[in-house]
Amino acid sequence: MRGLDYKWIEALDAVVYQGSFERAAEHLFVSQSAISQRIKQLEKFLAQPVLIREQPPKPTPIGKKLLGLYRRVRLLEHEILPEIKNDTTTRPVQLSLATNADSLATWLLPALQDVMKTRQVELKLTIYGESRSIEKLKSGEVAGAISLESQAIPNCRADYLGRIDYVCVANPEFYQRYFSEGVNNQTLAKAPAVSYDQYDDLHKKFLTEHFNVRPDSVIHHNISSSEAFLKMALAGVAYCLIPRLQITDELEQGSLIDITPGFLMSYRIYWHHWQLETGVLQEISQAIVNYAQRHLPQ
């Protein structure tokens, strides 16, 4: 019986990564019909679909598992083949990692910079909410993920990184305009806030747990950029919860003030990655864990 042909999965990976059959064909230097035929052969072999044919195409649950397998095999090939062939001209290894926006805006890039300088690696850092990134590792879409989840998924491990402390801040003018009578459920209901996106539960938790304010009762901007949070707060447009690590200078200079001293939202974060790692991925995991445990509150 014929086994699984990795050219079939290569075609699936190209379609998903490139976003269309046409671009996948260009990427692999084959015809579009060849791409379509390989995916049909894969689906026939498995007796189930691997691709949701919409725009852009998306993998089915079994397709995601195959992509995870394929990317792990590719990573192992990249580490082993140059040694076997004594070849130093191998293309950089491509690695996809899932991170939350606040880690990317504060400590993650300094943690990775030495590996990026010394190893041939192309990183794709994709931002997801802290509770969603682990799903990308489960599906095989990424090789590692920063998550709030402490429990490791099968065949992976979870290393504790540290704590991210969030403070609720605004500029002095904004504070006087909206909170001159104090920060309470009445004044919070009138003051515009900003959060990352509809999946951002941090601000909702802050309002309900500390002030018994329904999140849907406040003016709430969504901006998918941690850096824009800071700009909006500095401009006096909104108040926000933001990592203390990101605004150390602004708090010291007084351009931002902690409007709820005594209330601190903290999350423990973890690095989830494959148990059996080699080469550059192992170095990346070590760099992330070592840097975070040195620089984040523990």
Curated annotation (Swiss-Prot):
Question: What is the superkingdom listed in this entry's lineage?
Answer: Bacteria
Q: Which Pfam families match?
A: HTH_1, LysR_substrate
Query: Start and end of every HTH lysR-type domain?
Result: 4-60
For this protein, the DNA-binding region equals 21-40
Species in which this protein is naturally found: Vibrio parahaemolyticus serotype O3:K6 (strain RIMD 2210633)
Role noted for this protein: Controls the transcription of genes involved in arginine and lysine metabolism.
* SUPFAM superfamilies named in the record: Periplasmic binding protein-like II, Winged helix' DNA-binding domain
* Positions of disulphide bridges: none
| Record GO terms (molecular function) | DNA binding; DNA-binding transcription factor activity
PROSITE patterns, from UniProt? HTH_LYSR
* Family of the protein in this entry: Belongs to the LysR transcriptional regulatory family.
Kindly provide the name given to this protein in its UniProt entry: HTH-type transcriptional regulator ArgP
- InterPro entries under this entry? ArgP, ArgP_gammaproteobact, LTTR, LysR_subst-bd, Tscrpt_reg_HTH_LysR, WH-like_DNA-bd_sf, WH_DNA-bd_sf
Note the subunit structure.
Homodimer.
Record's PANTHER family?
HTH-TYPE TRANSCRIPTIONAL REGULATOR ARGP, TRANSCRIPTIONAL REGULATOR
